[in-house]
Amino acid sequence: MSNSLGKLFQITSFGESHGDCVGVVIDGVPAGLAINVDEIQIEVDKRKSGAKAHTTPRREDDRIEIFSGIFNNFTTGAPICLVIWNKNIDSSEYERTRSKIRPGHADFTGFMKYGGFNDYRGGGRFSGRITAGHVMAGAIARKLISTIGIEVIGYTAELGGITAKLPKHKDIRQNISQSDVNCPDLAASKQMVALIQQAAEEGDSLGGVVECIGLNLPVGLGEPVFDTLEGELAKAIFAIPAVKGVEFGAGFGASRLRGSKNNDPFNIQSDQIRTTSNNCGGILGGISDGMPLHIRVAVKPTPSISLSQPTVNLDTMTNTSLEIRGRHDTCIVPRAVSVVEAMTCIVLADLALRAGIIPRVIKQ
C-alpha cells in the first residue's frame, strides 16, 4: 500500500474510517512558517460532516492535535504530525453486512488484494474519512504557497446535472460562503440543494463536478517529462475517493476544436507575457505559464444508497441483494471541494520547493 505523496513537500497519510484516528505526517516544510492550529482547523471544518446540506449523519468534532513540527506557532523544519481522533463510530451496520460486497465501493478489490485482512468498517483505508488528513496537510501547504502570492479557490461547478454560471474570480469566495453546496452561482445553488433533498428522499445519491482555480502562479512550476504540473496534480487528485476524471483548461473539449481556436495567443500585459485566452488551463509543456490554473474534477455519485442492489455474498459465494442502512452522504461533491483545494495546494507547494521558488527557511 502506497501512502506518501510528494518529493520535497511530502505527506504520509495514515488511519482508517473506524480506527482510532486519521492523520498525516508532513516532511519538508521549511522552518519559520507562521502557522497556528486555528488556521488548520478552519480548513478541516470546511470538509467535516454537518457543514453542508445532506452530509452523513456521522458527526465528528474533527479537533486537530499537533504532535510535532510546530513550536510557538512556527514550523521548526522537523516532520509535522497532525492527528484527528475518531469518536463517533458505529460499526454495527458494517458487521451486519460484512460478507456482502457493496456495489461501487472498494470492498471487493480490497478483499482480493489484501486477502480479507483489510479493515472493512466504514470502508477502512478506502474511506473518504482519510481525506481529513489530506486537508490538514493542505492547510499548511496553502499557507506556504501564500508566501509567494499563490491563491487556490475551489467550488461546486455542477451537481446532478445542474451547471453553475461562474461569476468573476473576486466574487467566487463571497458567493460560496452563502451557499450550502459551495456553489458560487446562488440561483443554481438553491436548485442543487432541492435536488439533493429529492435524491435523499428517494434513497439515491448524486455526483457532480468540482472546479479549482490557482491564481498568481509563477511561470515554471512542473518538472517534465514525468513530473509535469498536470501529471502531479492528476495523481494527487485521483487519490481522493470517488474522483473519476480530471481535466485542465478546455480538457476533452480541446479535442473537438481546431488548432486556430484552441491555441492561446500571446501578448504583453503589464510588462508580462500572457495569453489572451486560457484553453491550456495555465499549463504548457507540463509547466505553469503564469495564467490561472484551471482544473475540473468529476466526482461520482455516493455509492452508499438505500435502494436494494444486486451483489454477492463472499462467505457463501452466492448472488444476493443489499440495502445499505449505514450513515452516508447523499452527495459528497460540496465536501470534496476542500479536498481538491488541499491536494492542489500540496502539489503546488512541492513543485515550488523543487523549483527553488520557496526557500528552506521562511524569513518573516
Swiss-Prot record:
FMN binds at residues 125-127, 285, 300-304, 327. PROSITE patterns: CHORISMATE_SYNTHASE_1, CHORISMATE_SYNTHASE_2. Reduced FMN (FMNH(2)). The keyword Lyase applies. It catalyses: 5-O-(1-carboxyvinyl)-3-phosphoshikimate = chorismate + phosphate. Its EC number is 4.2.3.5. NADP(+) binds at residue 47. Pathway: Metabolic intermediate biosynthesis; chorismate biosynthesis; chorismate from D-erythrose 4-phosphate and phosphoenolpyruvate: step 7/7. It comes from the Bacteria. It is an enzyme of class 4 (lyase). One of its GO terms (cellular component) is cytosol. One of its GO terms (biological process) is aromatic amino acid family biosynthetic process. Pfam families: Chorismate_synt (PF01264). Its cofactor is FMNH2. The keyword DNA repair does not apply. Homotetramer. HAMAP family: Chorismate_synth (MF_00300). Belongs to the chorismate synthase family. This reaction introduces a second double bond into the aromatic ring system. NCBIfam families: aroC, PRK05382.1. This is Chorismate synthase. It comes from Dehalococcoides mccartyi (strain ATCC BAA-2100 / JCM 16839 / KCTC 5957 / BAV1).
